């Protein structure tokens, strides 16, 4: 098998936040960048919108990972009349704050969603591998991604409108965005790296994700678009594959 071409650019991993107020966003969102394998940086102090502004300012080629769900379970999308991910993102922009009130099937105190309807297929795969992937409908508890996902989806539409491709709905390009799951990155080892600089869980998740992305950058740079209808509606999570 021919090896993928060598990627010559930067990778950016973002530990996201669903917080509503500015201060909570700026104290939790973290951005990690690896540029040449030896130099890397961590930064914070940005809101969601400002983080997307930062990404838009990155010179191509660039690979960007966000740790929130890019879609909803297919049954919910279809129930809302959505047949494409663009329609899901537009719906989140229009109705997302009402979902977070919450409105069923989103929940804070009691989950009424049957187990078989809580997760996207990629999350079911993660859970089958022993990872505690959360449902987008869950709005409370450690690791919940509901608010961040709902508030992040409209920003994916903005990135796409500005020239980024969003995997798995499109193939990788000079400017690619994809969904990451930092918990899965923690199994990787990075000899010689000073991981003590991660002074918070947010910094750790962004930093380790960026290092993992850099390690697998050549594969990331040639990701192909999904053809499966469910994946094209729900999205997918990129996971590092060890040869």
Predicted regions and their residues:
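RNase H-like (RuvC/DEDD) metal-dependent nuclease/polynucleotide-processing core
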Residues: 2-12, 16-243
């Amino acid at each position: 098998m021919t090896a993928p071409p060598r990627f010559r650019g930067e990778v950016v991993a973002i530990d996201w936040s669903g917080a509503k107020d500015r201060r909570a966003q700026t104290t939790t969102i973290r951005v990690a960048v690896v540029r040449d394998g030896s130099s890397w940086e961590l930064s914070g102090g940005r809101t969601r919108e400002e983080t997307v502004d930062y990404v838009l300012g990155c010179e191509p080629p660039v690979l960007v990972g966000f740790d929130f769900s890019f879609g909803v379970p297919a049954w919910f999308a279809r129930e809302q009349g959505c047949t494409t991910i663009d329609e899901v993102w537009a719906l989140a922009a229009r109705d997302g704050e009402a979902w977070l009130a919450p409105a069923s099937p989103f929940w804070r105190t009691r989950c009424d969603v049957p187990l078989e309807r809580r997760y996207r297929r990629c999350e079911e795969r993660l859970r089958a591998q022993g990872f505690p992937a959360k449902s987008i409908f869950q709005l409370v508890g450690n690791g919940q991604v509901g608010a961040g996902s709902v508030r992040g989806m409209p920003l994916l539409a903005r990135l796409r409108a500005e020239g980024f491709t969003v995997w798995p709905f499109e193939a990788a390009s000079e400017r690619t965005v994809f969904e990451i799951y930092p918990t899965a990155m923690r199994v990787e080892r990075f000899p010689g790296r000073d991981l003590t600089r991660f002074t918070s869980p947010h910094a750790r998740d962004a930093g380790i994700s960026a290092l993992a992305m850099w390690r697998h950058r050549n594969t990331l740079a040639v990701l192909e678009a999904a053809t499966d209808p469910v994946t094209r509606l729900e999205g997918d999570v990129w996971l590092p594959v060890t040869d």
